[in-house]
């Protein structure tokens, strides 16, 4: 069970304490539990959505978004901000992009990107609440964290050393693909046709963002992985709200 606790601690802000320093193998196996963590977050959001029934719509959507951000501790938003600054400030240069990505300060591009992504998420949540598409709250966090597993299965990690390298080097790849297949099946059981739309959108966004990473960096980093999750979740939410 330790890999599950590692995944919960790393991906969320829940008060999880590990019994000791995990081994690289345990870190790698924790990736297999990322979709399960996403499912847990989704169930929490779905339950909150039910509890908020009758709340004014704008407040309803705002509270859902706030809890969504709090569940992850804004970890992935931080990666999105760093990636946005680095992508524009890097001027197409790999080393410059990686250097800017490590800078903890956020520039105007990062701020604008965060505002736009959160605004689109909020608007999509508002529309989904009106349309009573509550199952989206379960499957979107699941798909987003399954995408992280897919990214590490298909993409090299470009920063030597550290947590990301351990995740990439010790991920059980055959089991990883099986977990992705099960995750897709769970989405289909939960949301039916809407899950088909969500999965297709997720695959398209995943392929596009992965292509950008590989072309610029030759692989992924922790920051670009976080950016992928945020942009993919936002895109799927908007897509479900529109279709």
Swiss-Prot record:
It is an enzyme of class 2 (transferase). Its cofactor is Mg(2+). It is found in: Cell inner membrane. Its EC number is 2.7.8.26. Keywords: Cell inner membrane, Cell membrane, Cobalamin biosynthesis, Magnesium, Membrane, Transferase, Transmembrane, Transmembrane helix. Pathway: Cofactor biosynthesis; adenosylcobalamin biosynthesis; adenosylcobalamin from cob(II)yrinate a,c-diamide: step 7/7. It is a multi-pass membrane protein. The keyword NADP does not apply. GO terms for biological process: cobalamin biosynthetic process. The chain crosses the membrane at residues 31-51, 57-77, 109-129, 135-155, 188-208. It catalyses: alpha-ribazole + adenosylcob(III)inamide-GDP = adenosylcob(III)alamin + GMP + H(+); alpha-ribazole 5'-phosphate + adenosylcob(III)inamide-GDP = adenosylcob(III)alamin 5'-phosphate + GMP + H(+). One of its GO terms (cellular component) is plasma membrane. The keyword GTP-binding does not apply. NCBIfam families: cobS, PRK00235.1-5. Belongs to the CobS family. This is Adenosylcobinamide-GDP ribazoletransferase. It comes from Pseudomonas fluorescens (strain Pf0-1). The gene is cobS.
């Amino acid at each position: 069970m330790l890999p599950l606790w590692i995944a919960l601690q790393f991906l969320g802000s829940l008060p999880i304490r590990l019994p000791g320093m995990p081994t690289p193998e345990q870190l790698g196996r924790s990736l297999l539990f990322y979709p399960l963590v996403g499912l847990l977050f989704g169930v929490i959001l779905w339950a909150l959505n039910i509890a908020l029934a009758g709340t004014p719509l704008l407040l309803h959507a705002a509270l859902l978004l706030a809890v969504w951000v709090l569940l992850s501790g804004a970890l992935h938003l931080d990666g999105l901000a760093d990636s946005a600054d680095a992508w524009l400030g890097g001027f197409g240069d790999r080393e410059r992009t990686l250097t800017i990505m490590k800078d903890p300060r956020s520039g105007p591009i990062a701020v604008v990107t965060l505002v736009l992504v959160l605004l689109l998420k909020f608007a999509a949540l508002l529309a989904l609440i009106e349309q009573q598409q509550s199952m989206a709250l379960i499957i979107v966090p699941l798909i987003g964290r399954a995408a992280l597993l897919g990214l590490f299965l298909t993409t090299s990690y470009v920063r030597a050393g550290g947590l990301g390298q351990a995740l990439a080097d010790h991920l059980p790849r055959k089991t990883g693909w099986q977990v992705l297949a099960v995750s897709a099946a769970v989405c289909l059981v939960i949301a039916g046709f809407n899950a088909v739309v969500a999965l297709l959108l997720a695959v398209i966004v995943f392929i596009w963002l992965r292509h950008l990473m590989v072309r610029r960096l030759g692989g992924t980093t922790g920051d670009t992985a976080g950016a992928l999750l945020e942009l993919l979740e936002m895109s799927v939410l908007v897509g479900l709200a529109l279709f």
